[in-house]
Amino acid sequence: IKEQYTNGIFDRLGAPIIVKPSVSGGSMGVGIKNVVENKAELNEQIYKMFDGYRGWNLAADGLIAESFITGPEYTVLIVGSYDKPGLAKIYTPVERIFHPSLPDKEKFLSFDRLWEIYEDEDPMPNEGNFYEYETPDAALIDAIQKISWDAYVACKGKGYTRVDVRMDSATKKLYVLEVNAQCGLSEDENYTSIGAILRVSNKTFAELVIEIINDAFLRTRLATD
């Protein structure tokens, strides 16, 4: 890269920032060293990402840098189409609560810890869970669902998605981290947050799959009418 490409980033975004692949899945290319405090750390991390990981090209679709939001993290499942809000299902969000031993800058889904590889990052003490899921404060649920739906509409989403949201602990403002297109689907909370979302919503995995299929049938009918 040319270092001038990173000029002014901290002036615009503040510190710390997180740099990550524009397109990825399963936290690939994301680790605690992606959170950087200055331009030297940023450039070093960018060079590492362009080098790739185990043959994967982490920068194939570019990299993005954004402010690192310190605060609680939520995730929301949506089934339906952006242009049919009355037929869409916005599930109750869950809060992803990270192990209390972690510093704030390490409370996110890093690849190393998520998949228990532990090449560069340590496991939790006493074999503790990296994270657990709980229902958020009831007073926040509507706002989390609204910002998630607005992000889905902005992306013209269809089918299903999972939207990750954070609240700035200082300002209490909600920010969308990403809209996960075709997120992993499983009822097992050890593999995806969908299992936790279904649990707090008192829904079965079969019911979710039926909702997704019915939405696909509806879009097909509307397209052929």
Please provide the spans of the model-predicted regions:
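A short small-residue
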Residues: 27-29, 120-133, 193
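Feature marks short, surface-exposed loop/turn motifs that line or immediately flank catalytic pockets
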Residues: 25, 97-101, 169, 183-185
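A short linear hydrophobic-aromatic micro-motif
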Residues: 17-18, 62-64, 160-162
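Phosphate-binding site of ATP-dependent enzymes
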Residues: 39-128, 139, 146, 173-175
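Short amphipathic alpha-helix with an adjacent loop that forms part of the alpha/beta core around
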Residues: 4-12
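ATP-dependent carboxylate activation and anion-phosphoryl transfer catalytic cores
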Residues: 85, 129, 134-225
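Glycine-rich phosphate-binding loop of ATP-grasp-fold ATP-dependent ligases
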Residues: 16-47, 73
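Short, well-ordered beta-to-alpha junction loops that form the rim of enzyme active sites
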Residues: 22, 67-68, 165
